[in-house]
Amino acid sequence: MKPQAKKTPYKRIALALSLCALLIWAILGTGASLAWFTDTSPEINNIFHFAGFDVEVSHRLTDGKWELIDGKTDVFDDEALYEPGYVQVVYLKVENKGTVPFKFDTAVNVNGCIKATNVFGQPFMLQEYLKFGIATADTEEEMKNSIPNRNTAVEIANEPLRNYYKSGSFELAPGGTKYIALIVRMPEEVGNVANYRGDTVPKIELGITVKADQITD
């Protein structure tokens, strides 16, 4: 017999939804180069340059300005109260500062989590109840217009996260820029199955990966 749904106030869940690892992977012909950006190497920023390959990744602040991402950048709101119906949109900007064209994709993966117990006494993990979506644009204005309101964001973010979510591939010529809207939400229909009880607070740590491959054709 399934437990009956009931209204239970949601406890505050401070999720570690931060950019804990930004990986830029450049495949240049015969070799591959990897650059990890984590809080253990604060001197490394998000600018990766090798043999004409130069990519920068930024995120948009609340005042509309853009900030380059490094290993200590909190891209997601780590004080967000995730409950059914909550939606968050993060805007990224990928720039080709080099001299060679490349194609890239963006992925979100779960780097770590803490399992908790819900109000029904059942174990659960947050990634089981979060959904993601990605929208892209060639200009900042186009990006803003692509998600004019919350309802549009909800319609876009319909892919389950589970442990990994990946976008399609996008091409970027030298001097080009691509804007990305990354949407995370907890559907309203989730209910109390993701509402924890007890002393163990559910937690999830996400990483964002940007993989870029040189276009040789």
Predicted regions: what they are:
Residues 2-12, 68-84, 140-178:
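Extracellular adhesion/glycan-binding regions together with long Ser/Thr-
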Residues 2-82, 200-217:
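Short, polar/proline-rich extracytoplasmic segments that appear immediately after membrane translocation
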Residues 8, 20, 45, 58, ...:
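Short acidic, gly/pro-rich beta-turn/loop elements at beta-sheet edges
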Residues 12-19, 31, 123, 127, ...:
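Generic N-terminal initiation segments characterized by hydrophobic and/or small/turn-forming residues
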Residues 18, 29-31, 36-39, 87, ...:
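Short amphipathic alpha-helical surface micro-motifs
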Residues 27-29, 36-40, 82-148:
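Surface-exposed interaction patch
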Residues 47-68, 113-163:
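A surface/secretory-pathway sequence property marking extracellular, secreted
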Residues 81-114, 162-217:
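C-terminal, structured domain-capping segment
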